[in-house]
Swiss-Prot record:
It comes from Limosilactobacillus fermentum (strain NBRC 3956 / LMG 18251). Its main location: membrane. The active site is at residue 145. The gene is htpX. Its cofactor is Zn(2+). This is Protease HtpX homolog. It is found in: Cell membrane. It holds the Pfam family Peptidase_M48. Keywords: Cell membrane, Hydrolase, Membrane, Metal-binding, Metalloprotease, Protease, Transmembrane, Transmembrane helix, Zinc. Its EC number is 3.4.24.-.
Amino acid sequence: MLYQQIAKNKRRTILVMAGFVFLVALIGAAVGYLFAGTATGGVIIALVIAVIYVSIMVGQSTDVVMSMNNAREIHSADEAPELWHIVEDMALVARVPMPRVFIIDDPSPNAFATGNNPQHAAVAATTGLLAIMNREELESVMAHEMTHVRNYDIRLQTIALALTAAISLLVNFAGNFMWFGASSRRDDREEGAGGVFAIIGSILLIILAPLAATMVQMALSRQREYQADAGAVELTRNPQGMISALRQLQHAEPMQNVDPASAALYISDPQENARHKSLSGLFDTHPPLEARIERLEKM
């Protein structure tokens, strides 16, 4: 059952990422059609911009994300013995190198992993997590984060952030020159019904693209959390430890200072109380904790 769930989530993730790339190409086509009269050129430019953003983000992700979240690095077990040794143990079990370890001074229990690959990864835990969780719960949380590292989720989330930023750049460009572009298209004497509908469709796509990108990014984050929960059980052989940790997180208050751009990285939504989720769930960075617990209980 465990390995079937992991395989299922991996297939879903591939579909989500394919949708992300398709969205980048689609917005590029719309921008290209509006301003140059050719969709092909826009697609090429959009994909090039996306590749550049991804390359920059992947190379600098750890330091940037840790700085955004006011995390301080610890360099030895002397500074946080229990956390250090648990991370060390979970990395050994997951067969990944020991990641860099950071602590965030915040009373709300939470944690996340970041980096571009298992060889250049980092994990962070809040002081609230260290104060509230017992050893089994903390092991499960770190095993959850090690699963993100082992499965390259950290790189995947970085790519998703970069693609969202690329789409925002394209949309901002289109918005700044919208009327100029539309006028240019009219000057090309393509004022027939088909041309008008194409222009209107392109404009609507540009307007809705950021919303769609956010929805795709959130869907990606939600699927990775389910998989990381299953991976934590695989590493610890202790489903009750993970269930207990998630129950602790159900009572957590929002973090005091967190960058919205990195919210999807955390094990639980750091921006709002877990008991108050959106009705549709489409814009939630994480699946409901109760749903995650139910899946673990069925294993």
